[in-house]
Design a protein with these regions (language model features):
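Short runs within selected transmembrane alpha-helices of multi-pass transporters and secretion channels
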Residues: 13, 24-28, 90-116, 120-140, ...
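Helix-loop junctions and terminal segments of transmembrane helices
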Residues: 16-52, 108-114
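Interfacial segments at transmembrane-helix termini and the short loops linking adjacent helices
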Residues: 66-100
Length: 231
């Protein structure tokens, strides 16, 4: 990629970084709780509840950012001064899902920290880095900036697939893979609608966001209720 393309890619990461900020706040509190719960009898149930809630909340937040990506881009990106950055929003939805996968990986790394298997964080991250480099070399020549965005998502997704299997060897807890797949697919569909802007696209986005909230809200409310009773 040239300097302009690299600049567009850099600008398009501004909104996805908001997801990372939200996750960091949660992760700081969660990491301590994970260590405290490591020796408890119900730690598997605890991990299941928190991870399910965390995923649900992050999927809703990601959907919200994708739905409002055009508005947020106009606020955060000065396309009047730098008109070449006006197209940055086209790549943002893929990067949002990529950063979301990174956040899930960060959560799973807490399992390694709590169970003292931190080397697994290293080698799974190494695999992701290798995938990212290889895919960037291949996809940038084919799709340019979008290729780089897809490579970012794919590398974090590969890391997630490895960690969701490996980390649960040390703390077995159930994961709803079908729900994860449905949520991820829904985010990509919302992203396609934002980019392509088909007829009635605003209505489609509104319906899609409501679906994401309703599909995930129950997990959040149930866990919050259980945590209150636990206290």
């Amino acid at each position: 990629m040239g300097e302009t393309a690299a600049g567009i890619y850099g600008v398009s990461t501004k909104i996805p970084n908001l997801i990372s900020t939200i996750s960091t706040i949660f992760f700081q509190a969660w990491n301590m709780s994970a260590i405290e719960e490591n020796d408890s009898k119900d730690r598997s149930r605890f991990y299941h509840r928190v991870f399910d809630t965390y995923q649900s909340f992050m999927f809703i937040a990601s959907a919200g950012l994708i739905v409002f990506v055009r508005i947020l881009s106009n606020i955060l990106i000065d396309s009047n001064t730098y008109p070449e950055y006006a197209t940055a929003f086209l790549y943002t939805p893929v990067l949002i899902v990529g950063v979301l996968m990174m956040c899930f990986n960060q959560f799973l790394s807490s399992v390694y920290s709590a169970t003292q298997h931190t080397t697994h964080s290293f080698w799974t991250s190494l695999v992701a880095a290798i995938v990212n480099i290889v895919l960037n070399i291949i996809l940038i020549h084919i799709w340019g900036i979008m290729g780089a965005a897809i490579a970012t998502f794919a590398s974090y997704f590969v890391c997630y697939c490895i960690r969701i299997v490996d980390a649960r060897k040390y703390v077995p807890f159930p994961v709803n893979h079908a729900k994860f797949a449905a949520n991820t697919a829904a985010l990509f569909l919302l992203g396609i609608v934002v980019v392509e802007a088909p007829p009635m696209w605003i209505l489609i986005l509104a319906v899609g966001f409501v679906f994401m909230v309703l599909y995930n809200f129950n997990a959040i409310t149930q866990t919050l209720g259980q945590l209150r009773r636990r206290k």
